[in-house]
Amino acid sequence: MNQAIAKQDRPVDLLKATINAPSIQEQFKNALGEHKDTFVASLIDLYTGDKSLQTCKPSAIIIEALRAATLRLPLNKALGFAYIVVYNNSVKVTNEQTGREEWIKVPTPTFIPGYKGYIQLAMRTGQYRTINADVVYEGEVRKVNKLTGEIAFDGEKTSDKIIGYFCYFELLNGFSKTLYVTVEDMAAYAKRYSPSVKKETTVAQLIAKANDGIIGKKVGWEGNFNDMA
């Protein structure tokens, strides 16, 4: 009997119990239709393989998963369309023993579209002829026109060193735009604005991740810098 209770208390069992609630099932069905079961299965797989997610309340995870479901973006790390990232947010609570207010860290799941997800959402509008994004290697940037914002990437690649990232889009009406950010600027941005980057992580360490060829198990800048960029 004790073993049965312990099994029921496993985090994944608590998540499944929450998902199986009729109201939650209805929300997933409304968002996904016949694809509901596949999406829920991928959510459970994601949760089972991510210890940080297991520290969060199941109800909070499902709220974020429903956001992905509403946008019809799969929650599969390997696909890169959408992620649920855990941030340790500061929350003010009242200490029951002292009666005083204090700040504590609470693991908070957060839905974040991946770059492939953003591209898919944009293409669904029917307004884009082309959308592309990729890394830029040393030697490929031939010319940058500050006045017009035009950038020529037709230079000869001289090494496998990643020096930056670009994105390009063209609308059906002919308007087009190219954006380019260096690895250094991207690392500085991540360090300054991303809650997922540890305080002790330096900009230099983030820059190194762009070229170390290592894809970590974590989601975010420290797990896969180039995908985030």
Predicted regions and their residues:
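Binding-interface segments
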Residues: V12, K16-A229
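Intrinsically disordered, compositionally biased charged tails
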Residues: M1-D9
